[in-house]
Design a protein with these regions (language model features):
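Non-heme di-metal
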Residues: 1-179
Length: 179
C-alpha cells in the first residue's frame, strides 16, 4: 500500500504541474496582442486540460483499485496539436508575407519560459518513470513524457519561426517567403 500512496502523491504532483502549465498558457494567451501567438497558447492550454483529465482518470483508478491499469486505445488516441498547428502556421504565413506578423519581446520571453516549463515537465515524468517499478506506471509516465516533449518541440519550433519566419520556412518547408 505504501507504493500506492507514493504513486498517488506522484500523480498529484503531475496534476499540479499540468494545472500550472494550463494557467501559464491561458495567461500568455490573454496577454498577447498577436493572434498567431494567441492561437498557439490557446491550443496548448487545451492540451494541458486533456493531460489533467487523463491523470485524474488514472488517479481515481489507482485510488479505487490500488493498482495501475493499462493505457487504453482511447487514452493513447490523444489528439496532438500537430494538425491544428499546420493550420495556424499557414495563417501566419499569410501575415508574414504581408509583413503583419508583429511579435513583442514579451511574447518571445513567454515562449522561452514555456519551453523550459515543458522541459521541466518531461524531466518530472522521467524521474517518476525511474522511481517506480510498476510496468504500467512506467508506460503511463513515458506516455506523459512524450506529450510534454511534443509540446516542447512545438514551442521551440514556434520560437524559431517567430525569430525568423523566412529561415523557418526554408528549413521546414524547403522554400522562403519570397518564393
Amino acid at each position: 500500500m505504501a507504493d500506492v500512496r507514493k504513486d498517488l502523491e506522484a500523480l498529484k504532483i503531475a496534476m499540479q504541474t499540468e494545472e500550472e502549465g494550463q494557467q501559464l498558457f491561458k495567461t500568455a494567451s490573454a496577454n498577447t496582442k498577436n493572434s498567431f501567438v494567441k492561437s498557439i497558447f490557446d491550443r496548448l492550454a487545451k492540451d494541458e486540460l486533456l493531460h489533467m483529465d487523463l491523470i485524474k482518470k488514472f488517479y481515481a483508478q489507482l485510488e479505487h483499485s490500488g493498482s495501475w491499469k493499462e493505457l487504453s486505445p482511447q487514452d493513447r488516441d490523444y489528439r496532438s496539436a500537430k494538425q491544428e498547428m499546420k493550420t495556424i502556421f499557414s495563417s501566419a504565413l499569410e501575415k508574414a508575407k504581408a509583413g503583419n506578423l508583429n511579435v513583442s519581446e514579451s511574447d518571445v520571453e513567454v515562449y522561452r519560459r514555456a519551453v523550459q516549463f515543458e522541459k521541466d515537465g518531461a524531466d518530472l515524468y522521467d524521474r517518476l518513470y525511474n522511481e517506480t517499478d510498476d510496468k504500467l506506471a512506467k508506460k503511463f509516465y513515458l506516455f506523459l513524457r512524450e506529450m510534454e516533449k511534443e509540446h516542447m518541440n512545438l514551442l521551440d519550433n514556434t520560437l524559431q519561426y517567430l525569430d525568423n519566419p523566412n529561415n523557418w520556412y526554408l528549413l521546414e518547408e524547403g522554400w522562403t517567403l519570397d518564393d
